Swiss-Prot record:
Residues of the signal peptide: none
Keyword terms of this UniProt record: NAD, NADP, Oxidoreductase
Protein name: Coniferyl-alcohol dehydrogenase
Residues binding substrate, per UniProt: S117
Listed EC numbers: 1.1.1.194
Family: Belongs to the short-chain dehydrogenases/reductases (SDR) family.
Catalytic reaction(s) noted: (E)-coniferol + NADP(+) = (E)-coniferaldehyde + NADPH + H(+)
Keyword Iron-sulfur attached: no
Organism: Pseudomonas sp. (strain HR199 / DSM 7063)
Amino acid sequence: MQLTNKKIVVTGVSSGIGAETARVLRSHGATVIGVDRNMPSLTLDAFVQADLSHPEGIDKAISQLPEKIDGLCNIAGVPGTADPQLVANVNYLGLKYLTEAVLSRIQPGGSIVNVSSVLGAEWPARLQLHKELGSVVGFSEGQAWLKQNPVAPEFCYQYFKEALIVWSQVQAQEWFMRTSVRMNCIAPGPVFTPILNEFVTMLGQERTQADAHRIKRPAYADEVAAVIAFMCAEESRWINGINIPVDGGLASTYV
């Protein structure tokens, strides 16, 4: 993968998929600026400690990022067992706010990679709602929209992964045509990460056991990270506006 001298920002860098993505990117010559609320235990070229759940924390992080970058990997996220407002803020509103704010810093030919989920696969059932939310400009404005269009707490994780997929696909081509910056989603299935058990709790034993029979095993974080890194590389320069499942075939079993 051609990543030498590319300067890439990775959120959620201190654990799981984010940490593995940073390792893969650096192994291929990229310069990695990590962002996380927790201190990392891996080697990075730079690190910004930040809380991405509110605009003030995001603005503080942005002020410490380079003026020119080549990519943004939005990997920070919280499971559906977290407070529903936190899920909305981190997994969607904050991600969108950060991405829109740093777009002007991403150089032509750059790439944005958003980590969605196979749990967002039912986005067509709520397409118009997701498009409407995606058109809302601003973090607090998004919160206001959600107050008018509340999401059931037990469904919030799936809902905001759906919303992320729709926003990414709707927005990607307009940005690419105007700035030559691509945006795509990577949709993991179950992954061996520190929060895997949280997803088991969120989905329940019945759904978890049903899905377990559909795949050989959960993914290892580096298997997802390799695809994220590829989407930042020159070799993927003509891929834009798609959502790529990295799930060992899980999504295909629902066809």
